Amino acid sequence: MEKDVPLLVASAPSLMAQAKEMMEGYTLKARKGLGQHFLISQGVLNKILAAADLKPTDTVIEVGPGLGALTEELLKRAGQVIAVELDDKLIDALTEKFKGYPNFRLIHSDILKTSPEEILGQDVPYKLVANLPYYITSAVLRQFLEAKLKPESMVVMVQKEVAKNIVAKTGDMGLLTLSVRFYGNPSLVSVVPGGAFYPPPEVDSAIVKIVIPQTTIMEGVSEVDFFKLARAGFGTRRKTLLNALAQGLGISKPVILSLLNGAGIDPARRAETLSMEEWKKLCLEYAGNPC
């Protein structure tokens, strides 16, 4: 992981000038209610693009293109870019800005009410690249990870603390970590300071990449069982697994103890200490012994 963005100060003025010109030309303002912080650092854009590893044949879905700084770079590299924007005030500006790009398509919609199948119109491989508004980060990740038509990879800008939770290791993992790791392999690309955006957010951000393979370590595990057990395990975090699962699942302690012993897990441990392999064992034990 790269810890800083050395090109931030040098590259910001050019993109900042472009952002101000576009905002003045279309009488635009960053809408706090939509969590808008427009990216103005070429150095940060370069890191996103390097992580995305785009090819001329790739299809990209971008959530919340904003003023189009990232969109423009994506269009230079990918075969098709489909941007989904909720803010009606940005639609005309984006349509005009990218009218010369035949590989650009803009959808005016709420991403949380639009499935990948509806966006793409067909079953094709795609990648998700986005500077996500903080307030919909978890919902967007969940939507695409749980979708029938999942992306090959996701490169997203999120709040730094959320990024730390996503990439946490065994011992520090929470429900968000498990939710992401059930479907893919997350990694932290770079921490991004507030000055990379206009207006700057009050907290730092981070670029996270999630690769979604054809098969994962959780292959063969019921999605329903996994999340049922995980939510129960983390429902009362300070409790031991024995107590948390018994309370969360509404099952007697002797039965839970039998499940944990069958999976080779000490009942005195806590949910955050389990590895993905141990969660898999527990899920398979649970599936094989319906309570």
Curated annotation (Swiss-Prot):
InterPro entries: KsgA/Erm, rRNA_Ade_diMease-like_C, rRNA_Ade_Mease_Trfase_CS, rRNA_Ade_methylase_Trfase_N, rRNA_adenine_dimethylase, SAM-dependent_MTases_sf. S-adenosyl-L-methionine binds at residues 37, 39, 64, 85, 110, 131. CDD domains: AdoMet_MTases. PROSITE patterns: RRNA_A_DIMETH (PS01131), SAM_RNA_A_N6_MT (PS51689). GO terms for molecular function: 16S rRNA (adenine(1518)-N(6)/adenine(1519)-N(6))-dimethyltransferase activity; RNA binding. Specifically dimethylates two adjacent adenosines (A1518 and A1519) in the loop of a conserved hairpin near the 3'-end of 16S rRNA in the 30S particle. May play a critical role in biogenesis of 30S subunits. Belongs to the class I-like SAM-binding methyltransferase superfamily. rRNA adenine N(6)-methyltransferase family. RsmA subfamily. This is Ribosomal RNA small subunit methyltransferase A.
